[in-house]
């Protein structure tokens, strides 16, 4: 990748007040992200990231413990979210909630409820995660809260 072009791109989105989405699929991606921030290619002090669990595993299956290598791996992360592939999506989402993160849930990653039955729609997946989050003392973000979570500290 041409780092000068990438630096220019990130300068543009910063100036245009576009919310970037930094998607990290593996702990190695966090190392690369850290280096790009240190080198000034990605501007900012604290940036929101999305950790993806299970995308490149056999059968696209995630496990809550897959999150552990990501935690505290970057001094440049302000808020973090995760999404998780497979039947353990809800367990991963609740693990994130319990550890201070946020979760993104959806049919693009999983179609199964925690009882392994098929979800009739995306809302069913969200409802079960919301109920679990409430039991942990967490709430579901409003649209405005979600935009704030995703706001980089340039």
What are the functions of these language-model segments?
Residues 23, 136-145:
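Flexible, glycine/charged-enriched surface loops at secondary-structure junctions
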Residues 60, 108-110, 116-120:
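Gly/Pro-rich active-site loop or hairpin
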Residues 114-140:
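C-terminal helical cap(s) of enzyme catalytic domains, especially alpha/beta-barrels
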Residues 143-154:
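Short, basic/aromatic-enriched C-terminal tail that caps enzymatic domains
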Residues 34-36, 115-119, 153-154:
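Short secondary-structure transition/capping segments
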Residues 1-108:
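Catalytic alpha/beta core domains of metabolic enzymes, predominantly
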């Amino acid at each position: 990748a041409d780092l000068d072009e990438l630096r220019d791109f990130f300068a543009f989105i910063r100036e245009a007040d576009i919310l970037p989405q930094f998607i990290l699929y593996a702990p190695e991606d966090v190392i690369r992200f850290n280096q790009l921030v240190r080198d000034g290619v990605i501007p900012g002090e604290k940036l929101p990231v999305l950790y993806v669990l299970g995308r490149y595993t056999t059968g696209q299956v995630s496990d809550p413990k897959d999150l552990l290598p990501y935690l505290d791996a970057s001094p440049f992360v302000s808020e973090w979210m995760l999404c998780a592939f497979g039947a353990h999506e809800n367990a991963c989402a609740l693990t994130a909630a319990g550890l201070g993160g946020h979760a993104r849930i959806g049919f693009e990653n999983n179609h199964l409820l925690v009882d392994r039955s098929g979800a009739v729609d995306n809302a069913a997946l969200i409802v079960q995660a919301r109920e679990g989050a409430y039991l942990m003392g967490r709430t579901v973000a409003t649209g405005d809260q979600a935009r704030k979570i995703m706001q980089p500290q340039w």
